[in-house]
Amino acid sequence: MREYKIAAIPADGIGPEVIAAGLQVLEALEQRSGDFKIHTETFDWGSDYYKKHGVMMPADGLDKLKKFDAIFFGAVGAPDVPDHITLWGLRLPICQGFDQYANVRPTKILPGITPPLRNCGPGDLDWVIVRENSEGEYSGHGGRAHRGLPEEVGTEVAIFTRVGVTRIMRYAFKLAQARPRKLLTVVTKSNAQRHGMVMWDEIAAEVATEFPDVTWDKMLVDAMTVRMTLKPETLDTIVATNLHADILSDLAGALAGSLGVAPTANIDPERRFPSMFEPIHGSAFDITGKGIANPIATFWTAAQMLEHLGERDAAARLMSAVERVTEAGILTPDVGGTANTSQVTEAVCNAIAGSNII
C-alpha cells in the first residue's frame, strides 16, 4: 500500500467548501484503487487565524509543512483583511520558502461547458501556462518614502535572475516537448521593458537550442491577450513572468468558461520540498456559504497532485470522471448549471466508482 501525507490548508472564503469536496473525491479514488492511502492533516491558517493571532500562519509554519508529500490549498483573501497581508502572509511564503518556482496552469474547455468564444471548437483551446513563481514582479522588493506627503513615492522592483529565468524556461521547453504539439510561446514585454525582459528573450533563445524538436515563438503580453481570444488554436504551452502569467491564466480560465474550472500547481521540480496544489478562483466571499462554489478546479488540481505523487492512473480516473459529469450537464451556476457543490461532488464520486471509468 502506497501512503502519502497531505497538508490541507482550506484558508478563506469558499476554500473550506472546495477543499472538503476535494478530500471527498480523493477518498473515493482511494476506495476505487485500493492500492494507495492518503493521510490528511488540516491546518486552520488564514484570515480567521490572522484576526486571532496577528499572523496568517505561525512562525514555524514552513517547518510544520516540510514533512508532507504535498499541500492541498483552498483560497486566501478576506474583505476585512488587506490583500497584501493575506497573500504575503500565507501563500507567497509557502511558494517562495519551498522554492516552488514552476506554477503550472492547464486550461481546456471541458465537455458540456459552453465557452464565451463564439468560434472556439472542440480542442481549439487546450493550453498549459507556465508561470515563473519565485521572482520577477512579485519579488517583494521596493518601498515607500515620504508617506502622506505630496511627494510620496512608491517603488516595486522586478528582479529577474539568469538562474531563475533559465530554470523556468527549461521547465517550459521540457513540458512543451512532452505534449503532442511540441509548441511553446514565450511571453514578455521586451519592447518597452528593455532589461529584464530582453534577458528573458535571450535566455529563451539559448535554451531553445537544447530542444530542437520544439517549435517556439515570442509574443508581447498585450498582443498575447488578442491571440488567446481570437486564435486560441495557435497556442499550446505558454511561459511568462510571474505577473504576466498571473494575468494571462485568469483570462485563460475565463475563456474556458469560468475560473471555477481553473487549477494550478506550484511545483518544486527538484522535489526538495512539498509542492502545493490549489484552484485559482480565490476566496469568492460573494458566494461563500451558499453551497454553489464550483469544485471542478479543486478536483483538477487534485489530479495534478496525484500525478505529481506518481498516481497517474488515479489522476486519469479523476479527470475522466470530471469530464463525464460536466458532459452530463451537472454544473454549478458559474458555468450555466443549477447544481450545487455537493451535487457535483457526489456525481464525480459516483463516476469514479462506476465500472466504465478507467
Curated annotation (Swiss-Prot):
Q: Name one GO molecular function term.
A: magnesium ion binding
Q: List the disulfide bonds.
A: none
Q: Which GO terms describe its cellular component?
A: cytoplasm
Q: In which pathway does it act?
A: Carbohydrate acid metabolism; tartrate degradation; 2-hydroxy-3-oxosuccinate from L-tartrate: step 1/1; Carbohydrate acid metabolism; tartrate degradation; 2-hydroxy-3-oxosuccinate from meso-tartrate: step 1/1; Carbohydrate acid metabolism; tartrate degradation; D-glycerate from L-tartrate: step 1/1
What does this protein need as cofactor? Mg(2+); Mn(2+); K(+)
Record flagged with keyword Lyase: yes
Q: Which SMART domains does the record associate with it? A: Iso_dh
Enzyme Commission code(s) on record: 1.1.1.93, 4.1.1.73, 1.1.1.83
- Which NCBIfam families does the entry link to? TTC (TIGR02089)
Explain the purpose of this protein. Answer: Has multiple catalytic activities. Apart from catalyzing the oxidation of (+)-tartrate to oxaloglycolate, also converts meso-tartrate to D-glycerate and catalyzes the oxidative decarboxylation of D-malate to pyruvate.
The protein's name in its UniProt record: Probable tartrate dehydrogenase/decarboxylase TtuC'
